[in-house]
Amino acid sequence: MKIPVDKLTRAFKMGASVKKDSDTPVRVSVYLDSSASRFLAETVRDAFVPQTTSGIVRVERLGEERIAPKTDTDVVLVLSCGSDRLESAVQELVIAGAPVCVLAESAVEVPFVEESTPMLGVVAATDKTYLLETLARWILDRTDKETAFAANFAFMRIAAANRIITSCALTNMATGALVFLPGADYPVMALAQVGMLFELAAIFGRGIKPERGYEVAGVLAGGLVIRAVTRALVKQTPHIGFAVKALTAAAGTYGMGRALVSLYERDVDYSRANEVVTATFSRVRDLVTTVAGATRPMASYQDASDLAA
């Protein structure tokens, strides 16, 4: 099954769009209360180091004066273990318009926040991993800059990747269940999987580079394998073929996404592969040049024979 050129073009346009999304400006304001523990301060300091020039983290002390964060702020973090100033400060920040999350070691230290809302929440923990994983999900739930946030802050990448993979798997599950024309689902699924690849590459800071071509080829080949397996299973269970197609499409896409995450976490070096491809291309070019040069005299000789005749 061939992928139409227009769909490949759309896939690479999608890559350019993802690159633009990853470069979207991200602004985080951090307010440090005098009661904040060293654990909270060090955890946030280490986690919020922008990995691109589009990310900015502003840090201020939480004083008695009225707080007025800048209007371009995407999310506000308040680090506190409880104080008399905390509640009024949080109210001022919420009114300013950006989502506010209070980071504490215990929810008891923030009694005025009874439950999370789209504009206000609490993440309380003494375990660094749990704190950051929960905070990552909290931020991703409240921003439309998921790719940019994950590209800038490494602790958010797994949470963002899980969302991308799950979304693509569910999309392809629906495609597998609803597309009944044989072979018609492959281009649609392949396009979604290539889009997933570009998004994952962007959030792990790999960028849209020529090396992605190897991965795109792997995704397309993997899609063909999934398609072959699906056909074999459908023949065995024709009465529930639509369900089999949906499940294998979802499982295959999910597995493909997990494999890509593993690949990007390791940062594979493609220099050797590039050397092989370059050398092969050079040999093919030389061979074509040699063959073309050898056929020119023969063509001239044939033309002369025709004239003599």
Segments predicted by a language model, with ranges:
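Extended, compositionally biased accessory segments flanking or bridging domains
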Residues: 1-61
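Low-complexity, polar/amphipathic intrinsically disordered segments that mediate membrane, lipid-surface
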Residues: 2-3, 46, 50-51, 66-70, ...
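C-terminal-of-GTPase-core extension/linker across diverse P-loop GTPases
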Residues: 6, 125-133, 137-177
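Structural motif
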Residues: 30-35, 78-83, 103-107
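A short, well-structured beta->alpha microelement
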Residues: 45-74, 81-90
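Membrane-inserting effector segments that mediate pore formation, membrane fusion
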Residues: 162-255, 259
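Acidic, carboxylate-rich catalytic segments that either coordinate divalent cations
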Residues: 261, 265-309
